[in-house]
């Protein structure tokens, strides 16, 4: 009897960096993460907030030490390009849902532009029933699938910018930059109601997360076809997540103290960081290796998160 030896497990690699992935429609964020993690044979990886399966676009993936800073992207503003169809409301607020009602579309482009302008700034959104937001420990979409509607409190979000991209009625494409927690489906529905005809979302593509943009992203198919060296070259450094923070450079002695978690007096530094009181700062050694992030407060630089490898 012939025995078949089990295939040896491929060794996992300790990678540090950020992959800007262009997620396709139809794939969940977790599935995209696992595919990328397998391709890179990475020991540790995580994403920076889910992107709905029906949405495409920028999904930053963090490897190794970069996972320590993924929360910063969770909190960051997001930019999307979206298309809505006026005159039709659906159960889910997008093209996957059943049609609730249809109405005539009597507005013109000028009315659309005026409606968009009304939604810039702080607005209150009622989260959609088809969402992962939980009520009594249960996702809202589970109630919705059971035919139940539960009361949801409105939440304040901020629309930083909202611009018309194209208007081919009944289809309207817009670009929006918004704070975390914004539901673009709900935004489309609310714009439709403001126009008196209702609307649902037919396309959603994320083009920006904080300082990161889609133009530098790569698809899973391209990664699959690439060599390992080519894949590795696509990884951005850990500090790509932190580019909006001011920075400070430490000499060897101060760097050693910082990496041991010691607080440093700002007066000890060769140059003070250009940070507001209580602001966060990127910290580097004399060779421009990232040591971590600190908070500058009351004349002291206090370590907040350390990068073990100096990636």
From Swiss-Prot:
The molecular function GO annotations come to: RNA binding; tRNA pseudouridine(55) synthase activity
Keywords in alphabetical order: Isomerase, tRNA processing
- Which residues constitute the catalytic centre? 52
SUPFAM superfamilies membership:
Pseudouridine synthase, PUA domain-like
Q: What does this protein do?
A: Responsible for synthesis of pseudouridine from uracil-55 in the psi GC loop of transfer RNAs.
What does the similarity note say? Belongs to the pseudouridine synthase TruB family. Type 1 subfamily.
Q: What is this protein called?
A: tRNA pseudouridine synthase B
| Organism phylogeny | Bacteria, Pseudomonadati, Pseudomonadota, Betaproteobacteria, Burkholderiales
């Amino acid at each position: 009897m012939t025995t078949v030896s089990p295939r040896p497990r491929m060794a996992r690699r300790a990678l540090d960096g950020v992959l800007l992935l262009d997620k396709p429609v139809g794939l969940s964020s977790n599935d995209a993460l696992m595919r990328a993690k397998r391709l890179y044979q990475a020991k540790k990886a995580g994403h920076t907030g889910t992107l709905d399966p029906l949405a495409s676009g920028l999904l930053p993936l963090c490897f190794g030490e970069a996972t320590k800073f993924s929360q910063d992207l969770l909190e960051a503003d997001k930019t999307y390009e979206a298309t809505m169809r006026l005159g039709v409301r659906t159960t889910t607020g997008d093209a996957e849902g059943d049609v609730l009602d249809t109405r005539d579309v009597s507005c013109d482009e000028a009315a659309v532009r005026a409606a968009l302008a009304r939604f810039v700034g702080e607005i209150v959104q009622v989260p959609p029933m088809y969402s992962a937001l939980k009520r009594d420990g249960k996702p809202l979409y589970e109630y919705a699938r059971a035919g139940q509607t539960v009361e949801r409190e409105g939440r304040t979000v901020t629309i930083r910018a909202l611009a018309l991209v194209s208007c081919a009625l009944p289809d309207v494409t817009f670009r929006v930059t918004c704070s975390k927690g914004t539901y673009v489906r709900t935004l489309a529905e609310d714009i439709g109601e403001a126009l008196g005809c209702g609307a649902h979302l037919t396309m959603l593509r994320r083009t920006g997360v904080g300082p990161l943009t889609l133009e530098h992203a790569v698809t899973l198919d391209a990664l699959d076809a690439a060599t390992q060296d080519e894949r590795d070259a696509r990884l951005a450094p850990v500090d790509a997540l932190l580019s909006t923070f001011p920075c400070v450079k430490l000499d060897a002695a101060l760097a050693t103290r910082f990496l041991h978690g010691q607080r440093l007096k700002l007066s000890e530094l060769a140059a003070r960081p250009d940070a507001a009181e209580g602001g966060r700062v990127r910290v580097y050694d004399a060779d421009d290796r990232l040591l971590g992030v600190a908070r500058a407060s009351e004349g002291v630089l206090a370590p907040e998160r350390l990068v073990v490898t100096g990636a």
